[in-house]
């Protein structure tokens, strides 16, 4: 695990302890049960069936490696723009300390459109999965670099029991082997090196030989141009999670359409 990931996970455990004190698990479960769900995987498959790229468009104000990406940050407006320009789903950062995200951003984005929403955070405990359901998420992220295989399997099973989709994220072939023990069809390959923070889309291409045909490869990070998109689609990678390229554009939805459609 990288130093930054170690620090983030330590903070997450502190946040979970504080959240449990303010909202016990059973109370949170009641909130979660009142939320409706949108079909995250189905939205991706519908784009594929129409011959299109399936874009999980990210709403992200900042990152540890790049700092603030977008000063004028109105999640509801960004969500509407993404929906109007062909996104399949949304991804919303809810981590506050490292990414300047927030639960309210996910709630605002989901209320502004009909797209399914991924809670983008560092999930290490079942409490966060109930939290995700309660805030209106339709899917969660599990990061293989942050979890051992048995815990990852347990968290996936719990998420599925609540009706949530799971995107499992890997950075290398060893993590892909772990991810392939899960049931989820969604395999995210993060092109960012966790130690150097550099990105290379070759990371995704180099792992395609490991992936069964019934899984959906989601390429993440470093997709910055139409050329990157074309390279991936030529390799039959048709699902993309993109944040930075859109967040830096004056009109995020228009940039999505320019890159993908």
UniProtKB/Swiss-Prot annotation:
The record lists the catalysed reaction(s) as:
1-(2-carboxyphenylamino)-1-deoxy-D-ribulose 5-phosphate + H(+) = (1S,2R)-1-C-(indol-3-yl)glycerol 3-phosphate + CO2 + H2O
Question: Mind telling me which InterPro entries this protein's record contains?
Answer: Aldolase_TIM, Indole-3-glycerol_P_synth, Indole-3-glycerol_P_synth_dom, Indole-3-GlycerolPSynthase_CS, RibuloseP-bd_barrel
Mind listing the GO molecular function terms for this protein? indole-3-glycerol-phosphate synthase activity; phosphoribosylanthranilate isomerase activity
Under the heading Pfam families, the entry gives: IGPS
State which pathway it belongs to. Answer: Amino-acid biosynthesis; L-tryptophan biosynthesis; L-tryptophan from chorismate: step 4/5
EC nos: 4.1.1.48
* Signal sequence range: none
If you read the UniProt record, what top EC class would you report for this enzyme, in one word? lyase
Q: Which domain of life is it from?
A: Bacteria
- Entry keyword set: Amino-acid biosynthesis, Aromatic amino acid biosynthesis, Decarboxylase, Lyase, Tryptophan biosynthesis
Tell me which Gene Ontology terms the entry assigns under biological process: L-tryptophan biosynthetic process
Matching entries from HAMAP family are given as: IGPS_B (MF_00134_B)
Question: Of which family is this protein a member?
Answer: Belongs to the TrpC family.
- The name on file for this protein is Indole-3-glycerol phosphate synthase
Q: What organism is recorded for this protein?
A: Burkholderia cenocepacia (strain HI2424)
